[in-house]
Each structure stands twice: as C-alpha cells, then as structure tokens.
Amino acid sequence: MKRFNAIRIGELVRIAVLVMPLLLGFGAPIYAAAEVHGEAGAHEAAAVHTDEAHGEAGEHAEGGHGEGGAGDVIMHHILDSNAMEFEPFGKFPLPKIVIGGFDLSITRHVVFMWLAALILLLVFGYVGNKYKSIKSNEAPGGVANAMEALVEFIRLDVAKSNIGEGYEKHMPYLLTVFVFILVLNLLGLIPYGASATGNINVTLTLSVFTFFITQVSAIKSNGIKGYLAHLTAGTHWALWIIMIPIEVIGLFTKPFALTIRLFANMTAGHIIILSLIFISFILKSYIVAIFVSVPFSIFIYLLEIFVSFLQAFIFTMLSALFIGLGSAHEGHEAEGAH
C-alpha cells in the first residue's frame, strides 16, 4: 500500500484548477489535493477500513506486518481517499473525474477544503454585513470584534512589519492564507475529520502561490534589471558562475521549506495521537489505556490545537517575510555590500 501522499503532476494540476477562484478575486480559496491511485487492487487494500479492522487492530499489529495492522490503520487515517467514512455508519464513495488524462476526482481532502472555504465565506460575509450595520461611534462585538483583532494582528505584526511599504496589497492573500490553513488544521482534529494540510500536494500548492507572489512583487518593485541584478548579489562578474546558481537555488528552497514545515508538523501530530491510542490495543491492557493512552492522547490533542494556530502563523509570517525580502530595494543593496 502507499505510505505517503506523493507529489504528482496530476494532483498539482487538480489543485491549481480548483484554486483559480482565489486568484480571480472570489471571497475564499478552494484548494484540492488527493492521492493519485495506483492499481485498483492496491488501492482497495489501502482503503479497507471496517469495524472488523478496528476491532482486531491490536491482534494484527502484534503480528507485525499483517494487513490491517496498527501501522496500516494509522496511515489509512492520514492518507487521502475517494470515500467519506463515518464508522460505524458506513463508507460513502466520492465521484471520480478524469479529464484529459488528469485525475480531478473529488476526494476526502477536497471535501474538507471546500468545507474550509465555505466556513471562510460565511464568517467573512457575516462580519462584513455586521460592520455595515455598525455606526462610526460604535465598537463591534462578538465574532466581528474577534475578526477585527485578527485582521489587525496580521496587518501590523505580520504584513507591515515584514513587508513595509506597499504591504496593503498583500493583506488579502496573507489574511486568507492564515485563516484557511488554520481552519484546515482544526478540521483535521474533529471526529471524522481529515487533515488536508497533512497532504504534501496541498502544502506545496500553497507554497507555490507564495513563490509566484514573491517573484511578481520583486519584479514590480525592482524592475526586470534590478531583479536579475539580485541574482549576482553585486559581486564581480568572475563570481557569477557561482553566485547565480546559488541564488536560483535559494529562490526555490524558500517554498520547499514552507511545504515541508507545514506538511511534516501536521502529519507528525496526527501520527503521535493515533499511535498513543493504539498502544492499548497492541498491549491489550485496560491499565495502559486508562493511564497512558487516554491522558497522553488528550495532552497531544490539546497541543495540536496550539500547533494548528502556530503553523498557520508561521506559514503566513514566512510568506510575508519572503515577499518583503524580494521587494525591498535596501535588501539588495545590503547584499551587494557583503
């Protein structure tokens, strides 16, 4: 069975197609990613998740490598699939769509990303209407007040402090990315939920958006000549053969770092929680379940809530930092001085 959501060209095309509404100015992004399935037999083996598999998880895990073992069940919960599962009520298959050789199927992660986008639309729509009804001398309350604090935090502590002049034009993207990632992270912690940010194709697509925004912003701020001059870092022409490859590699390591950071942190958290739960099944001990699995799982679960906010903040902060570094004239001059 497949152990990871591998990077696939078809998946990246699918994600890009589904997130185009964000670039066209809609109120919230719709991101998508899913595992491109291999042979039908292998896929069915990975997708099987029944009451029997749950009940015998400890016995299979004890065997070490049997189908339905603890490791297989854990990976099954983390990986994407073409079905929504609501144990013990059953499994509901999702439609498969293939266009021009590209798999654009609706998957579990796609459904939860649509749900996150819907939540964003409803919340921001409600807050927007709330502000329309508030008089100039009145203070907002409830959700509107909380959202105002969030917007001010992103504006002052993230966008303005890292981008500087012209930060306003990047606020919609940064605010949307923060809330979108946060909602996705939290949806992965609810019962029957799925963590789309644990899919490397999703985090890669988000990072690619940051990459292109960074490069376009840098070209607009410095011009083509200034942008290309950055690649040489003000060094003597004899060193260009060394500096240019280093600078080009540096351009791509930034989105790579964003991709792996978010993907690894969210995936690791879910693996730890599920592993702690399965300790009691593997050891077949109620004592372990009461004094180890349950309390430690609750602790990690609460920690994951904090990590959900933290990772959304880090991704947004680094995105703003990369945009600011690419747009700042003085940043290039400082590099040239070195």
From Swiss-Prot:
Its main location: membrane. It comes from the Bacteria. It is found in: Cell inner membrane. The keyword Membrane applies. Residues 45-66 are annotated as: Disordered. The chain crosses the membrane at residues 15-35, 109-129, 174-194, 199-219, 238-258, 262-282, 287-307, 308-328. F-type ATPases have 2 components, CF(1) - the catalytic core - and CF(0) - the membrane proton channel. CF(1) has five subunits: alpha(3), beta(3), gamma(1), delta(1), epsilon(1). CF(0) has four main subunits: a, b, b' and c. This is ATP synthase subunit a. The gene is atpB.
